[in-house]
Amino acid sequence: MTTESNAYRGLAWVAAMALFMQSLDATILNTALPAISSDLHKPAFEMQMAIIAYSLAVALFIPLTAWAAAKFGTLTVFRSAVFTFILGSVACAAASNLESLILARVIQGIGGAFMMPVARLAIIQAVPKQQLVNAWNLMATAGLIGPILGPILGGWLVIHASWHWIFLINIPIGALGILASGSVMNNIKGKAEKLDWTGFLLFALGLVGITLGLDLLGESQHNSSVTYSILVVGILLLVTYCGYAKNNENAILPLSLFRTRTFRLGIIANIFIRLSASGVPFLLPLMFQLSFGYSAEMSGWLLAPIALISVMLKILIGRILNRWGYKTTLISSALLMAGSVISMAWLDKQSSLTWIICNLMWYGACMSIIFTSINTLAVGDLSKQQSGTGSTVLSIVQQVGIGFGIAVSSIILNLYRHFFSASDCLPQAFSYTFLTSSLFVIALVWSLMKLHKHDGDHLRKMP
C-alpha cells in the first residue's frame, strides 16, 4: 500500500513540476519585456506578440490532447510535450529578433498545450479515487506558487543575470520531469476517435487571422488594407466553422454545449472579463519601468501581490458564494474589478508603494473571485458526457481571451501614445488606456445580468 501511495505521489509530483513550469512561464515574461525589447532593438510597446503567440498556440492545440494521448499513450505524449516546451525555451533564449522569439514562443505553447491536460489525464487514469484529492492538491499548489514567483524571479534574473535565464531555467525542471515520468507514469493508450481535421483547420486559421489582425491593427507601420483583410478573413473562417459545427456532433468543438444557458453566459462573460482586465499584467510592468522609472526587479515585487492575494482568497470564495449566490457575487466582483482598473489610471511615479500594492491586491482579489465563480458556474450545468468537452472549450476561451485582452490593450495604448505624441505624455497614455479598458465591464455586467437569481444554487452549500 505504501509503495502504491508513493507511486501516486510521484505521479502527482511530476504533474506538479509541469504545472509549475507552465504557470511560472505565464508570469515571468511580463517583467522582462523592456529588457528583451532593448536587446532585440524593438520598442517595448510592440512586444505583445511574444505573450500572445504562446496563449494562441496553447488555445489551438488543446483540442488535440485527448486524441493524441489515446493514439500515442500518455507517457509518450507527456514526454514529447515537455521536450517541446524545453526546445521552445532554448529557442526563446537564443532569439536574435522579435520574429524568432515569437516563433519560439509558439513552439513553447504547443508543448504547453499538451503538457498539463495529459498529466491530468494520467492522474485520473492511475490514481484511486480515495487519493485523487491529495494528488490534485499537490499539483494545484505548484500551480499557485508559479504565478507568485514568476514576476519576482523574472525581475531578479533581468537585473542579476540576463533575460535569457527566464527561459533557460525551464531546462533543468523539464529534464527532471522527463526522467521522473518514466518511473511513475504508464503509457496508457485508448481508442483514438477520428479527428475532425476540417473543423480544426477552420477554427485554428480563424483564430490566427483574428489575433494577427488585432496585433497589426496596433502597429501603425503596417498597411491598413492588409490588416483589415487578415482580420476579416479570420472572422469569416470562424463564422464558417460555426456553420460547419452547428449540426455536427463530431466537430472538434461541438456547439451543442452552448444550448446550456449558464455555459453560454459563462463563455461570454469570460471573454469580456479578459478584454477588460487581462491586459493589466501586460500594461503594469511597462508602466512601472518605462513611465515610473522602476527597475525590473522592483516591478516584479510589485506584481507579486496580485497572485499572492488571489491564492490567499481561494479558501474564502466558497463561503462568499454560499452567502451571496453566484449572480450577486459575480456582478459585485465585476464592478469592484472595474473600480480597481479605473483607480490604476491615477497611479503615477509620486504614488506611494503602499497605495500601489493595495491597488494591485484589490485587482487580484476581484479577479480571483470572478474567475473561480464564473468557471465553476459555466460547467456546473453540463452533463457528465459534456463536462470534459466543456472544460476544454473553457480552457480554450481563457487562453484566447488572454491573447485578445493583451492585443486590445496594446491597440488602445498605441492609439493614445500617438494621440499624446509628446514623449513626456506617456503617463497620460497609460491612464487613458486603463480607463478605456474598464469600459468593457459594461458589456460584462450586461451578460451577468442575464443570469437567474438561483443559477448555481446546486453548487452551493445553502445557509
UniProtKB/Swiss-Prot annotation:
Signal peptide: none
Statement: the UniProt record of this protein carries the keyword Mitochondrion: no
CDD domains for this protein: MFS_LmrB_MDR_like (cd17503)
Membrane-spanning ranges: 10-30, 49-69, 82-102, 107-127, 139-159, 165-185, 197-217, 225-245, 267-287, 298-318, 328-348, 354-374, 393-413, 429-449
A single GO molecular function term of this UniProt record: transmembrane transporter activity
Pfam family, one: MFS_1
SUPFAM superfamilies: MFS general substrate transporter (SSF103473)
Membrane topology label: Multi-pass membrane protein
Protein keywords: Cell inner membrane, Cell membrane, Membrane, Transmembrane, Transmembrane helix, Transport
Protein location: Cell inner membrane
Cellular component per GO, a single term: plasma membrane
GO process annotations (BP): transmembrane transport
Family to which this protein belongs: Belongs to the major facilitator superfamily. EmrB family.
The protein's name: Probable transport protein HsrA
